[in-house]
């Protein structure tokens, strides 16, 4: 199991495999519709990959897209707030310079620290909600009083934290994130414009859009404020900055209490300006510092958490399990994403139906289903869609594009979700087991749908006709069959299908294409379902066992049919003759005998058959195809049963035994003919000579000899024969073919009887004995020649 899990993670799909990156110039050229389409697809891909545990950390492009999404939705509100904030900052700056330059008089200012009361973390937890609210009101009022008279220019960290605590209960999440971003931007602009100090280790510049760019001097990477700013703390001015760095760390720990992600933060103390490192990944990337190394694997990592995650993937360890769904994860990040899908309510809720969503664009797409707007239309079939991702997946059904390929087996898929489900098949993570039959499934929805087979639940009802179904697809197919909605026609035979996938699978019967190949024996199949059933013959995987006789089967339907033999149940009865059958297919074939229907007709000779298998066997006679070949002697057969009978001639296995004389045979039909000799059954009688025959074949051969009818004629010499087998043996004289070869000496023969007589010379067997002198012979013809001497 550990090996399967390790192999699964080795070929895991990451977000980078499915992501498409644009440069700044390319992004500017995209119109709003194209940007929305790109954002929806990227966010959906990231959500699918993160949900199954293949993406541990949020990529920078996703963070940036989320910010772009929030900026677009709240642009009007944020612009008003930014203007108000900039006005207040300008007023504070003017008041500050008035105090500094008024008559050169230096005044002793009252600061917030002199009137503030601070609590430790332990003391804060002991306060009840009323005491916390009172404390917040007093501290905020003191800060407003000092700010109004200009005695407090910079906002203390305590006030920022209290404001966040207050706003989290009243303001939406979107405004909260962007308000904090603007709060940090205000002091940063004041530092850059008035103090004119250079940021440590960072060169400040602006691009053509007015966005701030930061150039790291160690690795020469350039960063902007979106999607994520990661900078290095300078080590050049270590002498007098230890206290400031400690101050910055304290502020950072305080900010982490309220938000796990902060893009940019600038703090000032003692006249120094610093850019906090919210993510030290770039710093270690620049210095190539990989302090954590796995001794068993020889791999080095930047963080201890990375090493622990890698160790779990190698050992297959899964410590993070959610009891509600039963899924276990190697990484806590994947576990957190799974828990969030179960217990955390998404912030964007639909007012019509109450459904909630994680992203606002998903809510907008959902609202279109209520108002009936489907802006994305397929040019091929005219089908419309509400979301671009569904439209792109549908287009791939027309183009045949499958961009998501499995690295292990090479199978391709049109969606990333399909690839993720397929990768689970390689890992064989079937943790959800059915208590009734023991069948295991990869996901809980698959198990939930399977349980409906046992309990008979049919939640999907067709209101017009009153029919109920276990799946939603059953309702759709029934509606199409009743309304006549069948749009997919086969150009070759004219057959109509309700879906493109059904038509695509049907076309393989015309083209003979078998894309699903067994990697063990090389046998091809037209569908993946047939291949899965075939693979069980190699692995001997028989999951469904009969409790009465112990016989096991590869499919649940086979077990169900087998159980009817124990119970004697025959639910399918013929209304005309009363005969009952265990399977519906047997009844369908039986009814064709009453009606004389033969739906399967040969296009070459016009012969019709009641069963498709009979037509398939008949077509092989036209094409000469003999797919069942025995490798030892090279003989091939049209049907598999003939190959099985032929194998018994090599092995000597004779399962059909006569109870009267204990003589055994390799074929049941030969035993049936032998039993007629004991019963003295001679049903066919010749009117010309008066002889009786046990079967019709011998009777017809006798008639041919009397009437001298020889319908089988040789094309080379013109010689005619009464039997087709005699013509086949005669043709080998012209062709020189000798298919029957002796394994002992290598001698070859034209007929099987010739080889059998030859084998008796090796074994010393002489079954033909003379009645007069008792001498035995290996062949019947030798005995006849000997009788002439007497």
Swiss-Prot record:
Residues 13-84, 110-181 form the KRAB domain. PANTHER family: KLUMPFUSS, ISOFORM B-RELATED, ZINC FINGER PROTEIN. SUPFAM superfamilies: beta-beta-alpha zinc fingers, KRAB domain (Kruppel-associated box). GO terms for cellular component: nucleus. It comes from Homo sapiens. A zinc finger (C2H2-type) spans 284-314, 348-370, 376-398, 404-426, 432-454, 488-510, 516-538, 544-566, 572-594, 600-622, 628-650, 656-678, 712-734, 740-762, 768-790. It is found in: Nucleus. The keyword ATP-binding does not apply. One of its GO terms (molecular function) is RNA polymerase II transcription regulatory region sequence-specific DNA binding. PROSITE patterns: KRAB, ZINC_FINGER_C2H2_1, ZINC_FINGER_C2H2_2. The lineage of its organism: Eukaryota, Metazoa, Chordata, Craniata, Vertebrata. Belongs to the krueppel C2H2-type zinc-finger protein family. One of its GO terms (biological process) is regulation of transcription by RNA polymerase II. May be involved in transcriptional regulation. This is Zinc finger protein 560. It comes from the Eukaryota. Keywords: DNA-binding, Metal-binding, Nucleus, Repeat, Transcription, Transcription regulation, Zinc, Zinc-finger. The keyword Repeat applies.
